[in-house]
Amino acid sequence: KEIIIPIYKKNILKWYKISKRIDDDISSVFMAINDRIEKNIIKEIKIVCGGLAETPKIAEKAQKFLLNKIFNEENINEAKKIIKKEFDPIDDMRASKNYRTKISQNLLERFLNENNKIKSTLY
């Protein structure tokens, strides 16, 4: 089964790969996000996560929560909590469960902040 990330006009699409080595290494965490924010409202959002389950999966609950919500710190923090509950990553030689969870939360916040032109140092 494939995961299709649609690209819409005025949307921002970014992907992040976190691994020990950038080249030729399996990701510890991968995230692709596509969204459109209009007048501070999240009008469209797609979030795909890798490294948090057996195969890459859509973060359906986080997407559903963020859709048509005001872009603010409170909603970002709630979406991070949802991501944590939505996935149950494994511990392996690439990364621990806690590391994968924290990185996925940080990447979501980083994307949303950068998309709204707020500088971020989160990984």
Question: At which residue positions do the language-model features occur?
Answer:
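C-terminal structural segment of proteins
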Residues: 1-123
